[in-house]
């Protein structure tokens, strides 16, 4: 039977001495994963900007003047070309995001065709398209979609300070529709929205106490975009962020914990500590939605320093020429990639 985390138990994890917490998280990580491998995903915007929602952190909202260039739906061939390059660069999962409140029925054949084509390449697929009903979720699942991303963002109590155009319960209903369809769930949150420690505790409790824990949990650090209401929020203290990663690993031991948006603001030492705390997945590529992502070459150099191997590569250290070949093949158009915090 899955453990149900209580408020007191979760608070106690946050109160643990830092190194004791790190030790426990690393122990839990090693029970369930190879500590020297990392899962790599690439995220592509298939429709950018003009979103009707009012998420206060998001440059894709039509309500804020952020200078984001609006783009229509990409052609299928453009998407397939990007997916091939992502696979050649070491990604095992191709994620696609559209700036919608929810997909329309007219969009479903387009989405289903993309999923089937990318699956033929041998990659896992993930989409983030906004709210889904059960019929839409079933169609995506039948097309072969492996994961659906729908973040909770923050705690139920703090949520209305961030978003008013979609309720917390609607998010939970979408996650239920995704799970019921047979797809895997990708759901996490954003740190740095102005939330208190209690909100971080409640967010991790909500995620870990879902009927089945998410297979993938992206932990985003707020990317402060000029023009959004959160452009001047305080920076997140790195050790607070590392602590959240560690607690997430302990509470969701079999989930992939992903370093997502905001990673470009972290130095190598902070990222290494996050990996030590149990993070074992990243978004790799030029851009995440609308914010910078660390350059591919730098990522691969960091992997080499830490002896981390992409999950779909051989489980031995890559040789120098293998790293160079991956770097060479990773040149993808930067204007197609965007920020995971907005999904």
Swiss-Prot record:
Name of the top EC class for this enzyme: transferase
Biological process, per Gene Ontology: biotin biosynthetic process
Pfam families: BATS, Radical_SAM
Superkingdom: Bacteria
Record-listed [2Fe-2S] cluster binding positions: 95, 126, 186, 258
Cofactor(s) in the UniProt record: [4Fe-4S] cluster; [2Fe-2S] cluster
Subunit structure: Homodimer.
Family: Belongs to the radical SAM superfamily. Biotin synthase family.
EC number(s) per entry: 2.8.1.6
Role of this protein: Catalyzes the conversion of dethiobiotin (DTB) to biotin by the insertion of a sulfur atom into dethiobiotin via a radical-based mechanism.
Annotated signal sequence range: none
Protein name, UniProt field: Biotin synthase
Radical SAM core domain sequence ranges: 36-254
Protein species of origin: Buchnera aphidicola subsp. Acyrthosiphon pisum (strain Tuc7)
Cross-referenced SUPFAM superfamilies: Radical SAM enzymes (SSF102114)
Pathway: Cofactor biosynthesis; biotin biosynthesis; biotin from 7,8-diaminononanoate: step 2/2
């Amino acid at each position: 039977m899955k453990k149900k985390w209580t408020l007191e138990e979760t608070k106690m994890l946050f109160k643990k001495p830092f190194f004791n917490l790190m030790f426990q998280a690393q122990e839990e990580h090693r029970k369930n994963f190879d500590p020297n491998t990392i899962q790599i995903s690439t995220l592509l915007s298939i429709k950018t900007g003009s979103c009707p929602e009012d998420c206060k952190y998001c440059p894709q909202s039509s309500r804020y003047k952020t200078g984001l260039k609006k783009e229509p739906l990409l052609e299928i061939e453009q998407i397939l070309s990007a997916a091939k390059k992502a696979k050649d660069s070491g990604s095992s999962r191709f994620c696609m995001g559209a700036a919608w409140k929810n997909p329309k029925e007219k969009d479903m054949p387009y989405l289903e065709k993309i999923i089937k084509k990318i699956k033929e390449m041998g990659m896992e697929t993930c989409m983030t398209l906004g709210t889904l009903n059960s019929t839409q979720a079933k169609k995506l699942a039948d097309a072969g979609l492996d994961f659906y991303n729908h973040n909770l963002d923050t705690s139920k109590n703090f949520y209305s300070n961030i978003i008013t155009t979609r309720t917390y319960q609607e998010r939970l209903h979408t996650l239920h529709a995704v799970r019921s369809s047979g797809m895997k769930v990708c759901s996490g949150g954003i740190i740095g929205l102005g939330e208190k420690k209690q909100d971080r505790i409640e967010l991790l409790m909500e995620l870990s106490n879902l009927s089945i824990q998410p297979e993938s949990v992206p932990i985003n650090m707020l990317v402060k975009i000029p023009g959004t209401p959160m452009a001047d929020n305080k920076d997140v203290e790195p050790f607070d962020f590392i602590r959240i990663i560690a607690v997430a690993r302990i509470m969701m031991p079999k989930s992939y914990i992903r370093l997502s948006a905001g990673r470009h603001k972290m130095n190598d030492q902070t990222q290494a500590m996050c990996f030590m705390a149990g993070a074992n997945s990243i978004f790799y590529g030029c851009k995440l939605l609308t914010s910078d992502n660390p350059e591919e070459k730098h990522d691969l150099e960091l992997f080499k320093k830490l002896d981390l191997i992409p999950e779909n590569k051989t489980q031995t250290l890559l040789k120098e020429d293998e790293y160079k070949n991956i770097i060479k093949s990773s040149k993808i158009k930067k204007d197609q990639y965007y920020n995971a915090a907005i999904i």
